[in-house]
C-alpha cells in the first residue's frame, strides 16, 4: 500500500509543472511581447555560424528578427507571422517560405525559445549556475509537426526570470545556442544586465 501511494505521488510530477517552474514561466505566458538581443550560434555539418540578433517578439502576432552582426549581413530582417517567414533588406522583401517546427533556422531561434517558455511541455526543472549567476534551468518539449523531438533548454536568472542562455536540440542534437545580452518585456525597462 505504501508503495502505491509513493507511485501515485510521483505520477503527478512527471511532465507537470512545479510552483517554481510555473512562477518562472508566468511572465512569458502573460506577456504582450518582448525585445531581446542575443549572440546566436549554429553548428551544421561541422561549420559554425554566429550572429548577433535582435528580436521583437509578439506572441501570435508579427515577430521581427534583425541581424546586428556580422557586418556582411547586418540589417537583414526576418518577419515571422502565422508560420510564414519573409526576409527583408531595406525596402526589398523576399518570401522565405514556411517556418517548420522540424526545420528551425537560426533566425527563428529566439522566437522558438520564447514560444517554448510559453507553451512547451515541461520535462526538467532545476537550479543551476550559468556563468556564476544562480538560475532556474527549464527544459521543455515542443514535439514537431512531423513528430521530431524538439527540446528547448533555458537558463533564467533566479532573481527576475530573465533569460541568460538558451539551447535548442532536435532529435537529441543541440543545433542552436543563444547567449542573451539584453531582454525586456513590453512596457518595462528591465534589461538583462
Tell me what each language-model feature is.
Residues 35-38, 50, 78-82, 167-168, ...:
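Extended beta-sheet lipid-handling architectures
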Residues 29-30, 38-42, 74, 87-145:
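Flexible, processing/modification-adjacent segments and terminal tails
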Residues 54-109, 176:
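An acidic-aromatic
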Residues 45-48, 70-74, 146-147, 173-175:
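Solvent-exposed loop/turn segments connecting transmembrane beta-strands
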Residues 66, 124-193:
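Gly/Pro-enriched, hydrophobic low-complexity segments
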Amino acid at each position: 500500500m505504501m508503495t502505491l501511494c509513493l507511485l501515485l505521488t510521483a505520477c503527478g510530477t512527471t511532465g507537470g509543472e512545479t510552483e517554481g517552474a510555473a512562477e518562472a514561466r508566468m511572465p512569458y505566458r502573460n506577456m504582450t511581447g518582448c525585445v531581446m538581443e542575443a549572440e546566436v550560434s549554429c553548428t551544421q555539418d561541422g561549420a559554425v555560424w554566429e550572429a548577433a540578433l535582435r528580436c521583437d517578439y509578439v506572441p501570435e502576432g508579427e515577430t521581427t528578427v534583425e541581424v546586428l552582426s556580422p557586418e556582411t549581413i547586418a540589417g537583414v530582417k526576418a518577419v515571422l507571422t502565422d508560420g510564414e517567414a519573409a526576409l527583408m533588406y531595406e525596402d526589398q522583401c523576399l518570401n522565405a517560405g514556411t517556418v517548420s517546427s522540424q526545420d528551425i533556422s537560426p533566425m527563428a531561434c529566439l522566437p522558438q525559445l520564447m514560444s517554448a517558455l510559453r507553451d512547451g511541455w515541461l520535462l526538467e526543472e532545476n537550479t543551476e549556475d550559468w556563468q556564476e549567476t544562480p538560475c532556474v534551468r527549464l527544459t521543455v518539449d515542443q514535439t514537431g509537426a512531423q513528430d521530431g523531438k524538439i527540446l528547448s533548454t533555458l537558463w533564467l536568472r533566479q532573481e527576475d526570470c530573465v533569460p541568460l542562455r538558451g539551447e535548442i536540440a532536435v532529435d537529441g542534437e543541440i543545433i542552436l545556442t543563444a547567449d542573451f545580452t539584453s531582454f525586456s518585456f513590453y512596457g518595462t525597462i528591465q534589461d538583462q544586465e
